[in-house]
């Protein structure tokens, strides 16, 4: 019985591995659920492959399966018949303990992120990242995310879609300040600060609650405040791809979780890197959460700083390092930066549930967390003004998404997705 099991597993692993090796040369990404779409027409699937190559691939699959099976086949033949253990309770307890211990490596550790394809990404050369991926895991991961999206969208003929979309593009007079040339400098340094769950309902200048974020209010008065700015989704992973890549969010899926797709997206950081910018991403949490690492490497980030770069004593919240510590780290990275121009992106986290922050200024936990991060923003900007890079640095503050506040707000209410984007140079 063991030998039958080993034979089946060996053949499946060999077929996936060899199939992946062949398909990668055509597709440029590791094997996923895509080949299964062609099972209904296998002749068409292999039409572009020469007959001799097809025969060679099948032969190599059997050879590789035999190599995998041979040691297990020999080992299984040497095991004796099963005997009931003398101490059944002790044996069961040991078996249960060993099975439970497997949960940690299967999950991928103790952090908020689970095992995902993006965890093995380590290089700015995508081919090396692909080489580190286990093809069997890649396929199984893809199958777990497979979903039929056809019923979630309405499709139109291109002509009708153009008619519907054209009015959304505006076309009226520009609302950009007439003296905008004073904001434009040649190859400025760029700081993109993404504020976790910040919402227009907490900003007075957007018609929200007064007194929550006085520092961002001040920055908005000194720079440019985009008041007609709305979040693309309600999740960070989808908001980030919208901010960096201009990719619209889908109802039940996140493109960040599909590295084979996200690697082909455009990106602000990718374009700036090609233009000679030094790029860096900072996040006080787990950079492997929702395949973030693979996405930011694909977007041209030269360096990623995350929770593992901070001592355990500073990881004080469920999500990681609080914002006052990470803002201080962000300031240090800018101060120590020797190469210009540079683009640095920073994702905050303290204003995420459960809103545990080292400050108690407001009674409401969400608003208090916003006020706390706002105070960190104020301290950071004041210190940054004293650095030489201040005069040639563009700072953009934007929320990844808003927050359901108050709790009874309806899903169709625009306040649910209204976010602000103050810009200062």
Annotate each language-model stretch with its function.
Residues 1-149:
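Transmembrane and membrane-interface helices of multi-pass
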Residues 25, 93-98, 106-109, 148-156, ...:
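Short low-complexity stretches enriched in small and charged residues
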Residues 39-43, 133-137, 158-161, 213, ...:
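Alpha-helix initiation and N-capping motif
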Residues 43-49, 76-80, 158-162, 256-260, ...:
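Short, highly charged low-complexity linear segments
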Residues 50, 84-89, 150-153, 157-160, ...:
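Alpha-helix capping and helix-coil boundary motifs
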Residues 54-60, 159-164, 296:
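Long, well-ordered, tryptophan-enriched scaffold segments
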Residues 125, 132-137, 141-179, 186, ...:
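The feature marks either
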Residues 166-420, 424:
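Solvent-exposed soluble domains appended to multi-pass membrane proteins
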């Amino acid at each position: 019985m063991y030998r039958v099991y080993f034979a089946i597993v060996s053949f499946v692993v060999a077929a996936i591995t060899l199939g992946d090796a062949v398909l990668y040369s055509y597709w440029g990404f590791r094997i996923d659920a895509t080949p299964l779409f062609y099972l209904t027409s296998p002749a068409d699937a292999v039409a572009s492959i020469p007959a001799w190559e097809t025969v060679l691939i099948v032969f190599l699959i059997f050879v590789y399966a035999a190599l995998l099976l041979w040691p297990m086949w020999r080992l299984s033949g040497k095991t004796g018949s099963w005997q009931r253990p003398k101490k059944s309770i002790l044996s069961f307890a040991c078996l249960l303990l060993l099975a439970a211990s497997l949960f940690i490596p299967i999950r991928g550790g103790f952090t908020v992120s689970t095992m995902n394809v993006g965890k093995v990404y380590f290089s700015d050369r995508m081919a090396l990242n692909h080489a580190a991926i286990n093809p069997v895991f890649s396929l199984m991961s893809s199958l777990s995310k497979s979903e039929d999206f056809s019923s979630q969208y309405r499709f139109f003929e291109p002509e009708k879609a153009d008619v519907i979309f054209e009015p959304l593009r505006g076309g009226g007079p520009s609302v950009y300040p007439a003296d905008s040339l004073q904001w434009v400098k040649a190859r400025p340094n760029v700081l993109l600060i993404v504020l976790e769950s910040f919402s227009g309902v907490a900003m007075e200048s957007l018609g929200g609650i007064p007194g929550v974020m006085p520092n961002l209010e001040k920055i908005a008065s000194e720079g440019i405040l985009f008041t007609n700015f709305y979040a693309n989704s309600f999740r960070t992973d989808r908001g980030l791809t919208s901010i960096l890549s201009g990719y619209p969010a889908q109802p039940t899926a996140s493109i960040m979780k599909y590295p084979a797709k996200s690697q082909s997206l455009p990106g602000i950081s990718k374009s700036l890197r090609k233009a000679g910018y030094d790029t860096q991403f900072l996040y006080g949490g787990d950079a492997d959460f929702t395949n973030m690492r693979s996405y930011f490497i694909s977007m041209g980030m030269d360096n990623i700083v995350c929770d593992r770069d901070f001592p355990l004593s500073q990881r004080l919240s469920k999500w990681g390092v609080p914002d006052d510590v990470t803002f201080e780290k962000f300031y240090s990275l800018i101060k120590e930066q020797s190469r210009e121009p540079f683009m640095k992106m920073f994702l905050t986290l303290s204003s995420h549930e459960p809103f545990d922050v080292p400050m108690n200024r407001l009674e409401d936990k969400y608003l208090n967390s916003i006020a706390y991060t706002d105070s960190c923003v104020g301290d950071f900007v004041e210190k940054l003004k004293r650095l030489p890079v201040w005069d040639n640095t563009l700072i953009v503050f934007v929320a990844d998404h808003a927050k359901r506040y108050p709790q009874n707000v309806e899903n169709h209410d625009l306040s649910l997705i209204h976010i602000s984007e103050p810009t200062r140079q």
